[in-house]
């Protein structure tokens, strides 16, 4: 019974959120804030390239017409730089943000 209630609630939420989903022909920009320079550059760059390859593969196979673009922004593994990188991501039109390395930048 509890499962059925949760399933109905989830369906109602998804049905009412139709305007929040990307439409055909739209590009969804996702900012990847991670160190792309300095000590952790190799890790951050590798993760960025992985996300970009996944997005490119999805874009080729995606029948819905929605495209995904991963924008890499260097946060230098610094909380202060992360807030600047977040502003830059918003200026570039990113609607979603993800971050990989470091709890300090993640909390910023």
Locations of regions flagged by a protein language model:
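Acidic/histidine-rich, surface-exposed loop or edge segments in extracytoplasmic proteins
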Residues: 31-39
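Bacterial N-terminal signal peptides that target proteins for export
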Residues: 1-8
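Short, well-ordered amphipathic alpha-helical segments that serve as non-catalytic structural scaffolds
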Residues: 50-57
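Beta-alpha junction/loop-to-helix N-cap segments that form part of ligand/metal-binding clefts
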Residues: 27, 42-49, 61-108
